[in-house]
């Protein structure tokens, strides 16, 4: 980042060289506006943030405690508040990203209204949200820098030392952080994937996540009916994304290859194998088949293939989809991941049915036999009942070790019994909560997870917060519900949102008006503004 005084000097030289053309321009004001708009394009952002991610991956390889995190955000404002909070409480945005969830785009950002996570939303909603998020993050930069500029002006008026403030400006840490953006299954064929990836990169995405499901039959990873595609189809889309990065000059752009094979039991195609042991034959080896001992067993339009020297008929459903053998999910995941890493993916995503460190670690161990530096992005999904999952885990561990568990309901007999609020302060629940608190650290250390994300936290946070407010406001508390539960807490936490006019850009706008109009500027933040009360 260019130094403040150097940039002011550059604009002074520019003004001198242009004569009357820049006669009304104050070089220092121009320098300030330039600093407030550090990133001119989304591609600039993608280049900058991709370098950050690669550096973070290198740090993780040296020490797995250096894992990274993100929260899924469905609006630019939620992303802005997340990054501002990280910067406020952690004193840095280092190792903190934004996640863009296809589920939340479908559920909250489609012009069709709320949709399930089945790639039914308009594909342009994805790059539009990326652009919106970075617009809000850049606005957070502009606001914070503006307050530093005002402090600098005040120091000059008082005749105090301005060096410390200029140093803060020069060392300003941007709110622009990497985005991991969900492209679902690519929204069509490989050309469609390439075109959408370009739009996402142009909006600022440095990391694109793609899954190995059939695009037109895509399902949420935590629902039934998932259909995977042969490796050749999936790898062509990884290749398409890589070409999009290279075309736009983002050489360090990242691809997360997600496999849903652990929970997917169906495939749409039987790929063509050209020689024994190739990737198609290995994929087909997982098919559920029935040996044909006599050709009379085949009916009209049945399909039969030769497999390991035998004639077999792949088991096919009424809808024409083929089934995999039960119990093959683990091995299919391993093959998916190894193949993806060998074909251009930077990171892996294994969608699991529960948050279990050992289960994830067992798969990563197999992958690392071939690719020792393999790293995962992991979905700490709200689709998991975390409370129940970890209480059951502790219950089972205690049961196996012979510990007395007689005071707790057996999950096999009472599936949701351990969720009862009466167990919240029990020793079992305390132990489960410790495991939940340690989950990300343990998984990073033991299971190769470089990045932990929560897909839908701001969806649930909005739902809960609105319910709590509405319950009190429309109930007996009236206005106190808002004042006590929101405004008073904002004030005492010293949140920027308390002064919502300033956060929305009023202060920046007033300063710009003064740059443009001088003493004739009509300002919004002068006397009479209620924001002075905060």
Task: Give each language-model segment a name.
Residues 2-453, 467, 509-534:
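Alpha/beta enzyme core
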Residues 437-471, 477-513:
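Substrate-binding cleft of secreted/luminal carbohydrate-active enzymes
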